[in-house]
Swiss-Prot record:
Protein name: Catalase-peroxidase
Catalytic activity field: H2O2 + AH2 = A + 2 H2O; 2 H2O2 = O2 + 2 H2O
Main function: Bifunctional enzyme with both catalase and broad-spectrum peroxidase activity.
UniProt entry keywords in alphabetical sequence: Heme, Hydrogen peroxide, Iron, Metal-binding, Oxidoreductase, Peroxidase, Signal
Source organism phylogeny: Bacteria, Pseudomonadati, Pseudomonadota, Alphaproteobacteria, Sphingomonadales
Family: Belongs to the peroxidase family. Peroxidase/catalase subfamily.
Subunit structure: Homodimer or homotetramer.
Keyword hit for Heme: yes
Length: 747
């Protein structure tokens, strides 16, 4: 699955061993590796740091994919013997390797942590992170302080990946292995879906403003966390297990937990289930002080290290001498079995503060309670441990209520953990049609943004033609139809595959009320289209029906065809029916609010109060979320301006005397030297003055003018502004428009 960007160690539910922050990492003064060597030539970005960065629109190209552009991972996965893969993974669980021995003779907890940390980077604000793409293989995630020693987990898995090759991606294999780990230790999971294609390069993701591991410049005011971030410090998945910035205050830790897990789409019950369920298994590793023992992370390693990092030169370097998170110990007496011991121990003892051998703050029973077996040394026993973040589950009133309920009702605990684990590992996959394999659960879940299956016959080509005529006969204008269709489609995010035209949620709260969507105008358009649908469905034969979701797109198509004809180009905009109308009950309003556009340069919309990036940067961000290339972004902006499709009917960037005609006038008039541009009295607006008369010809925003000021965008704009470009412009616009209208649908 492709991930896009512009621009969560511990708690780690990781079950098992929150990969800590070796002391080396815990020290806030530890800087991240330098991005470039001193001898590296200056890049254009170095010379001109304020230059608009278009690279997000060029990542994950087919050129970087060794499988080639025709490779279809979904089809390969369908040929996979999933039962055989699971059998091989289960055998691996108890086949301990001398180079990295399994704790308690079972790799299950280790692999749960791997899967958790693969998926746990997901964040709701922009849909980035998550298990899709297998990004844990690449920098920076493969070298985050929170991911210490997970490089070994993936190396343990390599023989299985090697065996099944292209039939299973690393992204799917890591999640599946986490599931099998749970099942092999007696837990019944909710299910598993394949379908996560691998990425072949690191995502360009804004993980925070800091340039040092574990720094936290992401906060401002009264500990307000910067959007879209969902972790407390650079290099952590969620929170610091020792407490906020190492402050061992469970109540303050609870605040961080609630915010970070909430930004990963988890409510209080799901959060408690994940932490308590995860810490039922395995142990944390902090047998020695990292300084003087633990080497550099994988990305900073020498070529002979072959991508393995954090090499430990003290003692055995592994087993009972392992250093990962820096915390040390297990939560239960049976860390490789599903039990309620974590919750029982949490409430059974009075916990007192201590430090691990690595120096990390943790908690042990005040009582004489030495009953936890050592993971490697026979007959050696330890006290159970808790993190500050564990004690938060008993100290915080809301969390205490939930842990008490789970302790009294183990079945409810198991069910909550199973569901939360499934959500954690599948949240970024998008609609259910992308789920593959025999283990996909039948139950439909609200966070999957469900859409109903069609129970009627689809419209055919003749119906499409007739419906376009009916739509145009409603009296709705071309710009109104285009704006409604774009508002529906542009909600899509390629990061987590949410939004888009399917489901017709443009009719529902919250989308119908978003300022960018012109609510009053949109309501009028939808009322007219609903009338067309009602009339057609009442009269249609052969069981045919048409959804409003389809009509919204079809209306935009009809308007574009009409506008192209005005420009002298005959074109038929491709249309594929199949969209159905979701209900309000199928729509989680709070969840969908994260899709609300704070900016959409394609319709010249920008809310300055809600953005950390400039209008032009937010245009690139929107294009990135829509999986567009630089040329596609360019032609769409030019076309939408010509179609007079700005939000609220604003005139900025409508560089034409014939708005509503699909002409290349935007580019012709922007590139011509007849106009001189200057800042207007209104902030963020520019005036285009006739060089001869001094009269104002046009007004514009930075989003409009960047296509003339940025050298790369100007080069593309010149293609579309040429005298022979009108037909190419229309055809390219139609192709890009059609792509956007179909985002989030089966290809």
């Amino acid at each position: 699955m492709r991930k896009f960007s512009v621009s969560k160690v511990a708690l780690l539910a990781a079950t098992m061993a929150p990969a800590l922050l070796p002391a080396a990492a815990r020290a806030e003064g530890t800087a991240a590796p330098a991005a470039t060597a001193p001898a590296t030539p200056m890049s254009n970005r170095d010379w001109w740091p304020n230059r608009l960065d278009l690279s997000p629109l060029r990542q994950h190209g087919v050129e970087s994919n060794p499988m080639g552009g025709k490779f279809n991972y979904a089809e390969e996965f369908k040929t996979l013997d999933l039962a055989a893969v699971k059998k091989d993974i289960e055998a691996l669980m108890t086949t301990s390797q001398d180079w990295w021995p399994a704790d308690y003779g079972h790799y299950g907890p280790f692999f749960i942590r791997m899967a958790w940390h693969s998926a746990g980077t997901y964040r709701t604000a922009d849909g980035r992170g998550g298990a899709g793409g297998g990004q844990q293989r690449f920098e920076p995630l493969n070298s985050w302080p929170d991911n210490v020693n997970l490089d070994k987990a993936r190396r343990l898995l390599w023989p299985i990946k090697q065996k099944y090759g292209r039939k299973i991606s690393w992204a799917d294999l890591m999640v599946l292995t986490g599931n099998v780990a749970l099942e092999s230790m007696g837990f019944k999971t909710f299910g598993f879906a394949g379908g996560r294609a691998d990425d072949w390069e690191a995502d360009q993701v804004f993980w925070g403003p800091e340039n040092k591991w574990l720094a936290d410049q992401r906060y401002h005011g009264d500990r307000k966390l910067q959007n879209p971030l969902a972790a407390v410090q650079m290099g952590l998945i969620y929170v610091n297990p020792e407490g906020p910035n190492g402050n061992p205050d469970p109540l303050l830790a609870a605040k961080d937990i609630r915010e970070t897990f909430g930004r990963m789409a988890m409510n209080d019950e799901e959060t408690v289930a994940l932490i308590a369920g995860g810490h039922t298994f395995g142990k944390a590793h902090g047998a020695r002080k990292p300084e003087g023992c633990v080497g550099v992370d994988p990305a900073a390693g020498a070529v002979e290290d072959q991508g393995l990092g954090w090499n430990n030169k003290c003692g055995k370097g592994n087993a009972e001498d392992t250093v990962s998170s820096g915390l040390e110990g297990a939560w239960t007496a049976n860390p490789i079995a599903w039990t309620t011991q974590y919750l029982d121990n949490l409430y059974a003892f009075e916990w007192v503060q201590t430090r691990s051998p690595a120096g990390a703050i943790q908690w042990v029973p005040k009582e004489d309670a030495t009953f936890v077996p050592d993971a490697h040394v026979k007959d050696k026993l330890h006290k159970p441990i808790m993190f500050t973040t564990d004690l938060a589950l008993k100290t915080d009133p809301a969390y205490r209520k939930i842990t008490t309920k789970f302790r009294q009702n183990p079945d409810a605990f198991a069910d909550a953990f199973a569901r939360a684990w499934f959500k954690l590992t599948h949240r970024d996959m998008g609609p259910r049609w992308r789920y593959l394999g025999a283990m996909v659960p039948a139950e439909e879940l609200i966070w999957q943004d469900p859409v109903p299956k069609a129970t009627y016959a689809m419209i055919d080509a003749a119906d499409v033609s007739a419906l376009k005529g009916r739509i145009l006969a409603t009296g709705l204008t071309g710009p109104e139809l285009v704006r409604a269709a774009w508002a529906s489609a542009a909600s899509f995010r390629g990061t987590d595959m949410r939004g888009g035209t399917d489901g017709g949620r443009i009719r529902l709260a919250p989308q119908k009320d978003w300022a960018a969507n012109n609510p009053a105008e949109l309501a009028r358009v939808l009322k007219a289209l609903e009338g067309v649908a009602t009339e057609f469905n009442r009269a249609a034969k052969d069981g045919k029906k048409v959804s409003v979701a389809n009509l919204v797109v079809l209306g935009g198509n009809a308007a574009i065809e009409q506008a192209a004809a005005k420009a002298g180009v005959t074109v038929e905009v491709p249309f594929t029916p199949g969209r159905t109308d979701a209900s309000q009950a199928q729509t989680d309003v709070a969840s969908f609010e994260f899709l609300k556009p704070a900016a959409d340069g394609f319709r010249n919309y920008y809310d300055a109060s809600a953005n950390r990036l400039s209008p032009s940067e937010m245009l690139v961000e929107r294009a990135n979320l829509l999986t567009l290339s630089v040329p596609e972004m360019t032609v769409l902006v030019g076309g939408l301006r010509a179609l007079d499709a700005n939000a609220g009917g604003a005139r900025h960037g409508v560089f034409t005397d014939r708005p509503g005609t699909l002409s290349n006038d935007f580019f012709v008039n922007l590139l011509g030297m007849e106009t001189k541009w200057q800042k207007a009295a209104t902030d963020g607006v520019y005036e285009g003055l006739d060089r001869k008369t001094g009269k104002t010809r046009w007004t514009a925003t930075p989003v409009d003018l960047v296509f003339g000021s940025n050298s790369e965008l100007r080069a593309v704009s010149e293609v579309y502004g040429s005298a022979d470009a009108n037909a190419k412009f229309v055809n390219d616009f139609v192709a890009a428009w059609t792509k956007v209208m179909n985002l989030g649908r089966p290809s």
